[in-house]
């Protein structure tokens, strides 16, 4: 327990690079002490029983782009919303969703409900000639995606901070055509209407991939794909991450994701 448990939690969640770990001992007493613990340093011993572990958010260091793998980047490389750390498409799911998109050499990719931008930005690292439209309605989302793009040295064609359904009801940003690939990660209660709007614009041989959390969402959206004449595939993505214990390692389950894929003939 204690400080060691906090550190294990950070490591297993991929957030160790996003926080400084401070230890406060005997706070308010004459012998109080505050210490910053480097990520690669062992915890000091002995620690006082009256102990507080404090996590202070920090911006991850700028990655060396040449040292990064081609895809499957660690979650901690991305800047994230400070009030929702860890709220992003995790590495294991990101790899599978990129595979499901079957990215072409060239074309237009829409990332709707882009979050931190992780999937669309990794797609640009794999296929630099793609034109990416990233849409995120959350306040500050566009600035976050642009900052992550700069860190990874890729350039989206457009990053828009708005509701995706409202955007598709109007004219597209300049320089962007209809999509060849769509990742539909947002929509909320309007997901059904959003999918209908996407299908109206999807090019022939285009692919739409929809990560979902519930069977009810699949039951609602799958018929729309089938009625529109798309070839439909459904997969469940499930992964576990090793989490260190005092005497070994346990496998901590990650949230399962249902990947609904439609391919236009």
Locate predicted features.
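Conserved class I S-adenosyl-L-methionine
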Residues: 106-115
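Conserved SAM-binding loop of SAM-dependent methyltransferases across substrates and taxa
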Residues: 116-128
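A short, conserved alpha-helix within the catalytic core of class I
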Residues: 189-197
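Short beta-strand element of Class I
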Residues: 129-133
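Conserved alpha-helix/loop element of class I SAM-dependent methyltransferases that forms part
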Residues: 88-106
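A contiguous loop/helix-start segment that scaffolds small-molecule binding in enzyme catalytic cores
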Residues: 1-84
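C-terminal substrate-binding/active-site "lid" region of AdoMet-derived donor-dependent transferases
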Residues: 197-258
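S-adenosyl-L-methionine
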Residues: 135-176, 190
